[in-house]
UniProtKB/Swiss-Prot annotation:
GO terms of biological process kind: methylation
Catalytic activity, EC: 2.1.1.9
Gene3D superfamilies: Vaccinia Virus protein VP39
Family, per entry: Belongs to the methyltransferase superfamily.
Matching InterPro entries: Methyltransf_11 (IPR013216), SAM-dependent_MTases_sf (IPR029063), Thiol_S-MT (IPR052356)
Entry-linked PANTHER family: METHYLTRANSFERASE LIKE 7B, THIOL S-METHYLTRANSFERASE TMT1B
Protein name (record): Thiol S-methyltransferase TMT1B
Tissues where the protein occurs: Highly expressed in liver and kidney. No expression in testis, heart, lung, brain, spleen or cultured fibroblasts.
Its biological purpose: Thiol S-methyltransferase that catalyzes the transfer of a methyl group from S-adenosyl-L-methionine to alkyl and phenolic thiol-containing acceptor substrates. Together with TMT1B accounts for most of S-thiol methylation activity in the endoplasmic reticulum of hepatocytes. Selectively methylates S-centered nucleophiles from metabolites such as hydrogen sulfide and dithiothreitol.
Compartments where located: Endoplasmic reticulum membrane; Lipid droplet; Microsome; Cytoplasm, Cytosol
Membrane topology annotation: Peripheral membrane protein
Length: 244
């Protein structure tokens, strides 16, 4: 079946030729940076309704980190529209990092709707290089649907470990590759070159759980979840936490 992948990729390319030409000419990225926040606002609102109970379960563990100050320093990496804010407990001091500056107005709206949080700042940066943040400055890093689209998951996870305090937690929720040998994986491979343009660099076939397990955290807890939308080529999800 592998021999079919290049042929089917070519067919998809021909069907979406205008998009690929815009990308080749350097015109697509500015368009994508503008429309992508609106797309994410729509999709996250729908998907979070399906995942709400699991999200609340995952992020409820943050309150256990509160010390005598009753505060938690929290970095949301690839913050997007701020859709996770509703799940964070009171007392979180939230710093947001995203390479797309067009998300900031969505973040402002989300913060206005979540007064139980303290909004520190929004940093325009890539996860591979968060030099604006000091070493061991965060109790928690949250990373949801981000490692699929970064240039180097390994470097991002190194930066996460750098900014986390000793014993700090990484909470993650990521979509990953379909099982090896499955027909679903074949279609992910076919669609991925085009999907990366549509999804602002999103990869469909990453085995992100391997990156997390190799990142030298002292402990990793991980569980699998089915994809929220059957009509999208996005595969199963992994959720969990890792301890520095």
């Amino acid at each position: 079946m592998d021999v079919l992948v290049p042929l089917l990729q070519l067919l998809v390319l021909l069907l979406t030729l205008p998009l690929h030409l815009l990308a080749l000419l350097g015109c697509w990225q500015p368009i994508c940076k503008t429309y992508f926040p609106y797309l994410m606002a729509t999709l996250t609102a729908r998907s979070y309704k399906k995942m709400e109970s699991k999200k609340r379960e995952l992020f409820s563990q943050i309150k256990d980190l509160k010390g005598t100050s009753n505060e938690v320093t929290l970095l949301e990496l690839g913050c997007g529209t701020g859709a996770n804010f509703q799940f964070y407990p009171p007392g979180c001091k939230v710093t947001c990092v995203d390479p797309n500056p067009n998300f900031e107005k969505f973040l402002t709206k989300s913060m206005a709707e979540n007064r139980h949080l303290q909004y520190e700042r929004f940093i325009v940066a890539y996860g591979e290089n968060m030099k604006q943040l000091a070493d061991s400055s965060m109790d928690v890093v949250v990373c949801t649907l981000v490692l699929c689209s970064v240039q180097s998951p390994r470097k991002v996870l190194q930066e996460v470990q750098r900014v986390l305090k000793p014993g700090g937690l990484l909470f993650f929720w990521e979509h990953v590759s379909e099982p090896q040998g499955s027909q679903a994986l074949l279609w992910q491979r076919v669609l991925e070159p085009t999907w990366k343009h549509i999804g602002d660099g999103c990869h469909l076939t990453r085995e992100t759980w391997k990156d997390i397990e190799k990142a030298q955290f002292s402990e990793v807890q991980l569980e699998w979840q089915p994809p929220p939308f059957k009509w999208l080529p996005v595969g199963p999800h992994i959720m969990g936490k890792a301890v520095k």
